[in-house]
Amino acid sequence: MTSTLELKADKMLKVQFVGDDDVLNHILDREGGPKIKKERAQLLVNTQKIIKKPENELEEDDQEVLKDHNYVEVLGQDVQESLKNGSATDGGNKVYPFQNRKHPEKMAKLASELAKTPRKSVLLNMKNDPKITIDIPQCSKGHSSSDKSQLKNNDKSEFLSTAPRGLRKRLIVPRSHSDSESEYSASNSEDDEGVAQEYEEDTNEDILSQKIQAQNREVSAPVFRETPSKKMKREKTSHLVEKYFEAHSSSKVLTSDRTLQKLKRAKLDQQTLHNLLSKVSPSFSAELKQLNQQHEQLFHKWMLQLHLGFNIVLYGLGSKRDLLERFRTTMLQDCIHIVINGFFPGISVKSVLNSVTEVLDHVGTFRSVLDQLEWITNKFKEDSSLELFLLIHNLDSQMLRGDKSQQIIGQLSSLRNIYLIASIDHLNAPLMWDHAKQSLYNWLWYETTTYSHYTEETSYENSLLVKQSGSLPLSSLIHVLRSLTPNARGIFRLLIKYQLDNQDNPSYIGLCFQDFYQQCREAFLVNSDLTLRAQLTEFRDHKLIRTKKGTDGVEYLLIPVDNGILTDFLENEEEEL
């Protein structure tokens, strides 16, 4: 490590010293002590200003400073001569052979003496380390005369080695590995406090103290300790995470499997259940009677609005079947009317048109539903004296909510002499109608909340409390088949047609599997025996078919559904196609 002092342009004084780490390692190697990690040298010392002094005074001051530290006497015998001559090579040759350990006892003695001697006035400016920027003023009571002259002339630039001071610091205070990565931090030891108190007498006290405070903030990294609230919050979060995984790690199913099907009591038939429910006394009977009387007062108003070209739809909580029945018995005794129970599982738009043509005394059949609708329209246009009232319970039922069914019923209601009054119960029933259908129906909406039980409307639905007959209604059949693929529906349609063709055959036990496979293969519905068996398994799971073996061991297929329902299903399929 090299420190350079410029005295003049023609005279150059250079002093070369060995670094702190090399001196310390040399001493500890001799004494067998532990080695300390190398640190960066802190040598460059600056004062605020440089004032030119006479040449003789500069030389004397420099020599006194060097003699005070006793560096020249220890580090090399011929260094003073090289300094006088201004030679840099001679001094370096005498310094670097120091590593040959020519004077080990003398170096150990020097180290112990320097550890006891008071420190000199030094200003550190650690420019070599980018992490540390700090200036620390230090002084001692035991200054020599040369040191006092140096303090008076603070504008002068000095290049002094801090090896003795750094060595003493390492011997007194061992280096601790703090969380901060800086290699130097401001110390709060007694020595530094004494130095700071003595330096307060200096004229630059305020400026230097501000620098120290600013640089201390840069050097010492703040240690943020966790507050109790943050610690509790972190522990609470960790507990929540642990509880989440504990709750989801269990493979045990907590859902109960106790259903009504596992009850040991025998299931009731429909008549027994109806008798038991009829014995239950209704609550709020007086209020319900008064509410129904308010609705009955609207009957004449409804009749007037129907003749004015409007159709009436009733909505609200509770069954409206009894209300429409009272309207029929009160106002339509002398009129032609048709009551359609939309909640019936076997109802379809075809059956609605058949009822209308039956009232009009038509004999014959129609090729399609559209032909039948066209005939009804022409009949009412030809005879203006014809009047027909249609009462439809549950117009939004599963069998009538289709787009084609609503379109046909809307065209019927748009005729001049057909009057429609219907009820809806589903919350989203108005979504069935777009603007075109709304214009056909020409509705007037009436809220008729009755709070009555849906006894008749739900009587055809499957219940866990009632024994099942085993027959599949048309609504369930359509619902199941709509969830299947087109090929699956085609396979089932072939089986229906074959069964309807043989309905008059008393010895018919079903369709042979091999014959059925051949028909499906010819219709390009299946390509292998396994494909057909997989599809039949799905039908069997939905209870659409039943298989049995004959006396010859051949497998036969049969649909356990009434032939009338199968006929309605085929008609419904043809209408949709």
Swiss-Prot record:
Region ranges (Disordered): 83-103, 133-204
Keywords: DNA replication, Nucleus, Phosphoprotein
This protein's record includes keyword Nucleus: yes
Disulphide-bridged cysteine pairs: none
GO CC annotations, alphabetized: nuclear origin of replication recognition complex
Basic and acidic residues bias (residue ranges): 144-158
Acidic residues composition-biased segments: 189-204
Compartments it resides in: Nucleus
Pfam families: RecA-like_ORC2, WHD_ORC2
Residue positions, PTM Phosphothreonine: T117, T227
Superkingdom per UniProt: Eukaryota
GO BP field: DNA replication
Per-repeat ranges for Involved in LRWD1-binding: 1-100
Residues recorded with modification Phosphoserine: S249, S281
An example molecular function term from Gene Ontology annotations: DNA replication origin binding
Keyword presence, Kinase: no
InterPro entries for this protein: ORC2 (IPR007220), RecA-like_ORC2 (IPR056772), WHD_ORC2 (IPR056773)
UniProt function note: Component of the origin recognition complex (ORC) that binds origins of replication. DNA-binding is ATP-dependent. The specific DNA sequences that define origins of replication have not been identified yet. ORC is required to assemble the pre-replication complex necessary to initiate DNA replication. Binds histone H3 and H4 trimethylation marks H3K9me3, H3K20me3 and H4K27me3. Stabilizes LRWD1, by protecting it from ubiquitin-mediated proteasomal degradation. Also stabilizes ORC3.
Family, similarity comment: Belongs to the ORC2 family.
Assembly and binders: Component of ORC, a complex composed of at least 6 subunits: ORC1, ORC2, ORC3, ORC4, ORC5 and ORC6. ORC is regulated in a cell-cycle dependent manner. It is sequentially assembled at the exit from anaphase of mitosis and disassembled as cells enter S phase. Interacts with DBF4. Interacts with MCM10. Interacts with LRWD1 throughout the cell cycle; this interaction, which occurs only with non-ubiquitinated form of LRWD1, prevents LRWD1 ubiquitination and hence stabilizes the protein. Interacts with POLQ.
Protein name: Origin recognition complex subunit 2
Gene: ORC2
